[in-house]
Amino acid sequence: MGKRWTVEEKRRLITNVIRGGYTDRIRWQVGPEIEHFVMERKSMKRVMYPGEKGVEGILETFLRRHADWTPTYDEGHLIGLEKLGNSITLEPGAQLETSLAPSESLRILLHRYQEILDALYEILDPMGYVLVTVGVDPFTPIDAIPLLPKHRYELMDAHMSQKGNLARAMMRQSAAFQVSVDVGSDADFVSKYRVLAALSPIFYTLFDSVPQREGKALEKFNARQEIWRHTDPVRTGIPPTVFDPDFSVESYADWVLSTPPIFVPCGGAIKATGDRTLSDILNETETEEEAQCLVKHGMSIVFPDIRAKQILEIRVMDSVPASWAFGAAAMLKGLLYNMNNMRRLQDMFTPMQVDWVERGKNSGRDNGIQGYYHSDYFVNWGLGLLAMAREGLSVQEGKLLDPLEILWKNLDTPRSVLARNVAKEGWTKALRKWEARHVLS
């Protein structure tokens, strides 16, 4: 037996992490993460991890050419690189993620992204590979996608595939665009978390980029949303108490504590922990250091639409081309970092219920951009939120919203644009247009 932690002590292990990230408004930044599929340029066949011609070889070549990047190895395999807060990491199916060091300036973030892409394409071009930003691999069957050689991924795969019939698809076939935003206080945490939870059906729907999976056209919309809804319900979606009057940082901590961490990564060999909760397993830790390690893991192995760490991670958008992705980042900055906009959003979504959010997700799944949610159509939500966001941005950053405005005014989403291009010229040419290569206009 380890130390007997009180409920309050367990909560504090988590709330200390969240509160440790609080910053003054004048220092708030935005941090984008873009996940890509590595594909063969000619065939658009997916490139997997193993070997010198795989994603592993791409990272190894990158490290040889850029020795100032710090490598991360797992069980002898290179799985990540980091430099000055920018990183290149891999998702379980070798989706390649670029995380950009946060900045107040979206223009600086675009330049950072372009610099990483330029360095990657020095390697990819001779190999005949490209990076493609789309929410779900349109072709490759699940069984043809090996996981990275990490024992923890095997444990996650085994556990979550028992909880949801699309868990294996989540790990192997999906790709996202995520944005991290700063928080200033407990009150700011609660207001941002609630607003973002309420906005989640809107962002899932308007950034849907998936017309096909495993070679079959999809009748329903919002494929990534539905994959997450059928992965492991206790660790996905939104915490059930988010719209309760007394929701707090402690409430979020309680939700994390009630979730099984799947395995224990601290203090030696990784071992599976089944359905035991983080709260239960904390009682077996001997030291504060071991408990903090376990809590850090527990906060990372939940996958809600909005995940709290030292920042809030917004996880409800498909991977999409940069013009739309950075439009989304600008949109979120303009909405969340402007006090007038936050007050208006809180008024719009008060009162609110988890069930209403779920119904909104159902409407997006069934009807796409022409679906209806919380008193309006998704397209009107999108255009209205863009207008609000412009009020919270400089004229220069407001221009990043223009591609989204054009998209939604035409009743389009990334999915409908891609489907139309596929119908005209086939998948190979259509996906080449979605290659992540030149992102500076």
List PLM regions with ranges.
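Long, well-ordered mid-to-C-terminal structural blocks that present hydrophobic/aromatic surfaces
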Residues: A272-W356
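Conserved phosphate-binding loops in nucleotide/dinucleotide-binding enzymes
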Residues: I108, G184, D188-F189, V316-A325
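Short, aliphatic-rich beta-strand segments
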Residues: T98, W255, E313-R315
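Generic hydrophobic alpha-helical segments
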Residues: S43, S185-D186, F203, P321, ...
